[in-house]
Design a protein with these regions (language model features):
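Short, surface-exposed ligand-recognition loops at beta-strand->loop->(often short) alpha-helix junctions
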Residues: 9-21
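An amphipathic, aromatic/His-enriched active-site/gating alpha helix that lines ligand/cofactor pockets
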Residues: 25-37, 53-90, 101
Length: 101
């Protein structure tokens, strides 16, 4: 069994090019740190959602460290990191607008 995470990121003032670029960098970093798949979903004018899949709980837990580091960047983002559960696979029902990896 793996872990799927879904993480909302609200950017005060809207999704600027800088905010989207930072989100891309975070997604690529997640992939480097063990995520098997990472998707970025636009939700409204000021919110992005990461949908990420991990092979095990230990690799998923490292996500929090990566996200906290990203929050110290120049672009202010409010992260909701409290989601994650063991699953056998994704349900495929998300409206995925942009596949990053």
């Amino acid at each position: 069994m793996g872990v799927v995470g879904w993480h909302s990121v609200r950017v005060p003032g809207g999704l600027t090019d800088a905010a989207v670029e930072l989100a891309r960098e975070v997604a690529i970093s997640l992939k480097r740190h063990g995520a098997t798949q990472v998707y970025l979903i636009k939700v409204g004018d000021d919110t992005l959602r990461f949908l990420d899949f991990w092979p095990d709980r230990a690799s998923y837990d490292r996500f929090v460290v990566i996200a906290e580091a990203a929050m110290s960047q120049d672009v202010p983002m409010h992260w909701d990191l409290m989601h994650g559960e063991y699953v056998s696979g994704g349900d495929g029902n998300a409206d995925i607008l942009l596949s990053l990896i």
